[in-house]
């Protein structure tokens, strides 16, 4: 039995019948299926996005493996892309009464449990080869298979849920809010406030590797269970009304080869624009997020001069996350009214222009917490439409492709989208690691005089005050990664998105889709 038949038979068991009965999108589906459930399912991944690289660097010490720390995340992108394309094909070739994407949420749940546990069971004793193999296999099991199995299906849900533009906009807003909230709560509240000193135990100015490793193993059990729970909750509280249309009309769907879907997408300029938007925008966000814990730990004097730098950096990181999260929270309410008034494309472009200007504020003083926090708020305000509206724009593009091609390309498109959202994480970690390594990053910092910044070579015999900080090259890398990268990508995206005019085709596309369905059903 192949995987698509297995997914169909599994989903059509009575126990896996959706709890959503209404033909219209209602509160339980909105609140649970598109916010609470994905929030839980993506919670662990949000923490990994902010802290997994630091776990590898400071706890497992993978910089001792030389180029491995840089090459693994970058090379793994190949496997992530292949994994997402494979899962996208599974989705497009699955047809069940419970949909074509949702069945893979069931399959993703146990896969996530296994993959997360393996990532944090890396043997710390023994030869380096065993550790490198374990890290490589577990890393790719999570990022190239388990998480894409959920995320590719999850990302398809807005476009498969309904053709009602208003409902789609609301679902896109809530779905993106869940992703943002999981990052805000996980990476900016739970870990920095409650778990920073637990997961990164300090000892003699450095990291207590054994204690930190033990604590990460405990937390991994909680994270894998929360992820699996979120997968199942989203499965039960969502519904694929678009997929049901063809089933109810008895439309016979052929299995679409990858080549046909590829040709149907790559010859359309709107598809390229929206995909390049996600690629560029996400690259800037991930470089920023991956460097945030490093930046807060090493760029603010209040942290460097603290008696407990890890605890202080955790508190400041939490504060920075909360301050930056204020516009994000407000955005849940105002994003769609703004998009209705201006149009989705204009809302995104106008907002990002504001973000570019706001992003320049922090360069008045990159060591000032106040300046950095103010800049984050301004960037957050401007990026509200980009964060909440673009999934609805992607749905419009998918409808436009369906009208032109006569078939939907959700699976392939969302596999590309998922490859970007998941695969870029590893690529950005690799880029950041290579920059930090080249600049001379040290996980304990360099002992120096706090006034003159002169390096103290012999700490044991030095009688003056000592602080541990990174040297100039590392500070420049962190300033670029955390403060400049996203501003640069915003500017590029503004130029790109100004050409996305798919909204003017919406009414014509919906009419054409209905005509195609009637022809296929011989009505």
Language model regions located:
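Membrane-embedded alpha-helical bundles of multi-pass transporters/translocases
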Residues: 2-523
């Amino acid at each position: 039995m192949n995987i698509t038949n297995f997914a169909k038979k599994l989903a059509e068991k009575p126990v896996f019948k959706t709890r959503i009965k209404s033909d219209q999108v209602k509160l339980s589906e909105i609140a649970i299926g598109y916010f609470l459930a994905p929030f839980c399912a993506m919670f662990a991944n949000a923490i990994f996005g902010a802290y997994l690289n630091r776990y590898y660097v400071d706890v497992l010490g993978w910089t001792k493996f030389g180029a491995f720390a840089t090459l693994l995340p970058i090379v793994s992108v190949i496997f992530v892309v292949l994994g997402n394309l494979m899962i996208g094909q599974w989705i497009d070739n699955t047809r069940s009464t419970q949909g074509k994407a949702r069945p893979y949420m069931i399959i993703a749940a146990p896969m996530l449990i296994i993959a997360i546990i393996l990532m944090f069971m890396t043997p710390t004793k023994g030869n380096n080869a065993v550790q490198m193999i374990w890290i490589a296999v577990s890393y790719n099991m999570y990022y190239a298979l388990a998480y894409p199995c959920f995320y590719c299906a999850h990302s398809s849900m807005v476009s498969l849920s309904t053709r009602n533009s208003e409902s789609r906009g609301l679902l896109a807003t809530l779905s993106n809010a869940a992703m943002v909230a999981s990052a805000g709560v996980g990476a900016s509240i739970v870990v920095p406030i409650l778990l920073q000193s637990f997961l990164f135990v300090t000892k003699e100015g450095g990291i207590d590797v054994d204690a930190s490793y033990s604590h990460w193993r405990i937390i991994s059990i909680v994270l894998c269970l929360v992820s699996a729970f979120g997968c199942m909750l989203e499965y039960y509280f969502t519904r694929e009304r678009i997929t049901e249309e063809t089933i109810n009309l008895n439309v016979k769907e052929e299995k679409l080869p990858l080549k046909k879907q590829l040709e149907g997408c790559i010859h359309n300029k709107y598809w390229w624009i929206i995909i390049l938007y996600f690629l560029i925008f996400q690259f800037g966000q991930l470089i920023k997020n991956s460097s945030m814990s490093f930046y807060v730990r090493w760029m603010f004097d209040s942290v460097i001069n603290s008696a407990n730098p890890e605890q202080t950096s955790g508190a400041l990181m939490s504060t920075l996350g909360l301050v930056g999260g204020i516009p994000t929270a407000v955005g849940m309410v105002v994003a769609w009214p703004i998009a209705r008034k201006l149009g989705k494309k204009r809302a995104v472009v106008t907002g990002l222009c504001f973000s570019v200007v706001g992003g320049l504020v922090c360069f008045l003083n990159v060591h000032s917490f106040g300046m950095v926090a103010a800049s984050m708020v301004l960037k957050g305000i401007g990026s509200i439409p980009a964060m909440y509206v673009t999934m609805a724009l992607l749905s419009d593009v998918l409808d436009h492709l369906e009208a032109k091609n006569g078939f939907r390309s959700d699976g392939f498109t969302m596999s590309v989208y998922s490859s970007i959202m998941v695969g870029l994480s590893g690529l950005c970690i690799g880029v950041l690691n290579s920059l930090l390594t080249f600049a001379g990053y040290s996980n304990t910092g360099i002992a120096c005089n706090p006034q003159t910044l002169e390096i103290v070579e012999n700490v044991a015999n030095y009688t003056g005050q000592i602080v541990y900080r990174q040297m100039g090259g590392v500070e420049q890398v962190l300033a670029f990664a955390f403060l400049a990268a996203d501003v640069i990508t915003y500017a590029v995206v503004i130029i790109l998105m100004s050409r996305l005019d798919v909204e003017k085709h919406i009414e014509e596309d919906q009419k054409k889709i209905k005509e195609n369905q009637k022809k296929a059903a011989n009505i």
